[in-house]
UniProtKB/Swiss-Prot annotation:
Gene behind the chain: wash
Record-level Gene Ontology MF annotations: actin binding; alpha-tubulin binding; chromatin binding; gamma-tubulin binding; GTPase binding; lamin binding
Subunit structure: Component of the WASH complex. Interacts with spir and capu. Interacts (via N-terminus) with Rho1 (via N-terminus).
Keywords: Actin-binding, Differentiation, Oogenesis, Phosphoprotein, Protein transport, Transport
Region Disordered, residue ranges: 317-433, 448-499
GO terms, biological process: actin crosslink formation; actin cytoskeleton organization; actin filament bundle assembly; Arp2/3 complex-mediated actin nucleation; endocytic recycling; exocytosis; heterochromatin formation; microtubule bundle formation
Biased composition (Acidic residues): 490-499
Organism: Drosophila melanogaster
Protein name per its UniProtKB record: WASH complex subunit 1
Modified positions (Phosphoserine) in chain numbering: S491
Biased composition (Pro residues): 333-363
C-alpha cells in the first residue's frame, strides 16, 4: 500500500502490490474492491444529500416567487394606492453563511484503519525472509516536494506580502464580498494599530502623503465659488440660444384639468395631494385651532303695527311706532319711499292711540304673512331709511339760518303780490335793507360806484345810460308782509322758490 499524493481527499483506496503471492494478491484484491465499493457508495450518498438540500432551497425560492407573483397579480387590477415599506436598505431575512462542503476534509481515514485492522496477521509468516528474492525488496526514489520547487523570488514575495502592506486577510473576519470594500483605503481595518503601515513607508512617500492630505483638507475647508457667483454678469451659453420661454408669474397659461380623471389603467384613484401652503400656514391665527366665538350683539328688533287694508290700498292710517332697538329688523314689506325732505308727521290723536290695544310682540324672524284681513293686523315693517344728506339742502339751510345781515327771511318772487307798488324803484339808488337780497343790491351799487369813480350813486347812474338800463332790469327786493303767513309757510315757500 502506497501513500496517496492527494492529501486533501477524504477517501483513499489501497493499491494491490505486485510483489505478493497468489493468495495474498487475491485477499488484497478483495479488500481493495470492498474499499472501492464503500467509497463509491459514500460519494454518491453525499452527492444525493447535496442535491436534496439544493432541491429544497430551490423549492423554497419557487414558493417565494409564487407568493410574490400572487401579490403582484392581486395589485394589477387594484385602483387604490398602496405603500410598501422595506425592512432594511437591502431587505434580507438571513445572513450569508458559508456553503457546506460536499466532501469535507477528514483528519483520519477510518476506512484505511479498518482495512489495516482486517489484514491477517500471518499473511507474510508463511514465507520466510530467505524465500524472498532480493529483487523484490523495496526500492526508494528521491522525489522533490512542491515546497522545494519554489524559487527564491517567489518565497521573498510571499514573505513581503505577509509582513508589509495591509497584511493578510484574517481567516474568520471576511464573511462576504462587501466586507472586502474596507480594503480600498490605506488603513488596515482588522489591525489594532492603524498607523503601523505609515512607519514602514519610505520618508519621501510619507512627506508626499502628508502634502496630499494637507491639500485635501484645504480644499474641503474652502470650495471654489459656483458659476453663478464667479460669472454672474455673463450669461450661460445655451444650445438653443436666447430663445427660451420664461413666463412671468401671471403670464403662464392656466391648464384646465378635470377634478376626476377617467379610468386609467395602472393609476390609483385615491391619491390625495396636499398643497405646501396648506401644510405650512403663514397666518399666525391658523396655529390656534379652537378660537373663542365672539358673543352676538344684543340688538332688539323693532315692531311696527299698521292696518293691513291701509297698507294694501296705500291709505294713510294711524301708525304707532315703537322703537326699542337701534338696528332695523329684516325687511319683509317695503313701504312707499317718502320724499327726500320728509315733513314731520302730525302728532297722533291721543284718543285713537289709547283706543287701540297694544298687541303682543310678534316674531320677526323669517317671512311674516298677514294673519287675517282685520283692521289691525301686525306687520313687521322696517324703519324708513334716513334721508340722504344733500349738500345743496345743507347750503340752503345755512342761508335760511343766517337770514342776511339783519336776520331777514328769504321769500320766493312768485309769492309777492302783483298789485303792490314798490316805492324803492322810484328812488334811484335808495338804500333798502332788511333782507339778504337788499344787502346784495346795495353791494352791487357800491361796486358800480367804485368802478365809475363817482361818490354819488345818482350821478353814476345818470351819466351812464347802460347802467341805468341794467338797474331797471334787475328786480327790486321784495319786502316781506308782516303777519301774512306763519313761519312754517315761509319755510315751505323758500323751499319751493329754490327748488
Amino acid at each position: 500500500m502506497e501513500e496517496s499524493p492527494y492529501l486533501h481527499s477524504p477517501y483513499q483506496v489501497a493499491i494491490i502490490a505486485t510483489d505478493l503471492h497468489h493468495e495474498d494478491t487475491i485477499i488484497q484484491a478483495a479488500q481493495s474492491l470492498d474499499c472501492l465499493h464503500k467509497t463509491i457508495n459514500s460519494i454518491f450518498e453525499r452527492i444525493d444529500a447535496r442535491l436534496a438540500r439544493n432541491g429544497s432551497k430551490v423549492e423554497d425560492i419557487n414558493n417565494r416567487v409564487k407568493r410574490a407573483q400572487a401579490k403582484i397579480d392581486a395589485l394589477v387590477g387594484s385602483k387604490r394606492a398602496i405603500q410598501i415599506f422595506a425592512p432594511a436598505r437591502f431587505p434580507a431575512s438571513d445572513v450569508l453563511a458559508p456553503l457546506p462542503a460536499t466532501f469535507p476534509q477528514v483528519a483520519a481515514n477510518p476506512l484505511m484503519e479498518q482495512q489495516v485492522d482486517q489484514l491477517p496477521q500471518g499473511t507474510y509468516s508463511s514465507h520466510s525472509a530467505a524465500d524472498q528474492k532480493p529483487d523484490d525488496a523495496d526500492i526508494f526514489f528521491h522525489v522533490r516536494g512542491d515546497r522545494e520547487q519554489e524559487s527564491p523570488l517567489v518565497a521573498e514575495r510571499k514573505i513581503t506580502n505577509r509582513t508589509a502592506g495591509l497584511g493578510i486577510l484574517p481567516a474568520g473576519g471576511v464573511r462576504s464580498v462587501p466586507s472586502l470594500m474596507r480594503f480600498n483605503t490605506n488603513e488596515f481595518a482588522y489591525g489594532e494599530d492603524l498607523n503601523a503601515w505609515k512607519r514602514s513607508l519610505p520618508p519621501q512617500n510619507a512627506r508626499r502623503v502628508a502634502s496630499q492630505s494637507t491639500q485635501l483638507t484645504g480644499e474641503k475647508q474652502l470650495a471654489p465659488a459656483p458659476h453663478s457667483l464667479a460669472h454672474g454678469t455673463t450669461k450661460l451659453a445655451t444650445p438653443a440660444g436666447d430663445l427660451r420661454y420664461n413666463p412671468a408669474a401671471l403670464a403662464a397659461p392656466a391648464i384646465d384639468v378635470p377634478l376626476d380623471l377617467p379610468d386609467l389603467p395602472g393609476i390609483a384613484n385615491d391619491l390625495q395631494y396636499e398643497p405646501v401652503e396648506e401644510q405650512t400656514p403663514i397666518a399666525p391665527s391658523q396655529q390656534f385651532g379652537d378660537l373663542p366665538e365672539l358673543p352676538d350683539l344684543g340688538l332688539e328688533e323693532q315692531d311696527i303695527i299698521v292696518q293691513a287694508i291701509a297698507a294694501q290700498t296705500h291709505i294713510p292710517g294711524p301708525v304707532r311706532r315703537k322703537s326699542v332697538g337701534q338696528c332695523p329688523s329684516p325687511v319683509t314689506a317695503a313701504p312707499p319711499p317718502p320724499p327726500p325732505p320728509p315733513p314731520p308727521p302730525p302728532p297722533p290723536p291721543p284718543a285713537q292711540t289709547s283706543a287701540i290695544p297694544s298687541p303682543p310682540p310678534f316674531p320677526t324672524k323669517g317671512a311674516v304673512k298677514p294673519l287675517s284681513p282685520s283692521l289691525a293686523t301686525p306687520l313687521n315693517m322696517p324703519q324708513p331709511p334716513p334721508a340722504t344728506e344733500d349738500p345743496r339742502s345743507e347750503l340752503m339751510a345755512a342761508i335760511r339760518n343766517a337770514g342776511g345781515v339783519h336776520g331777514g327771511r328769504l321769500r320766493s318772487p312768485a309769492a309777492a303780490p302783483l298789485d303792490v307798488v314798490d316805492n324803492s324803484r322810484s328812488k334811484a339808488g335808495g338804500a333798502v335793507t332788511g333782507d339778504l337780497m337788499a344787502d346784495l343790491h346795495n353791494k352791487l351799487m357800491l361796486r358800480r360806484k367804485g368802478i365809475s369813480g363817482s361818490q354819488n350813486p345818482v350821478e353814476a347812474t345818470a351819466g351812464n345810460p347802460l347802467m341805468q338800463q341794467l338797474s331797471r332790469v334787475i328786480p327790486p327786493p321784495v319786502q316781506p308782509r308782516k303777519g301774512s303767513k306763519s313761519s312754517d309757510e315761509h319755510s315751505e315757500d323758500d323751499e319751493d322758490g329754490w327748488n
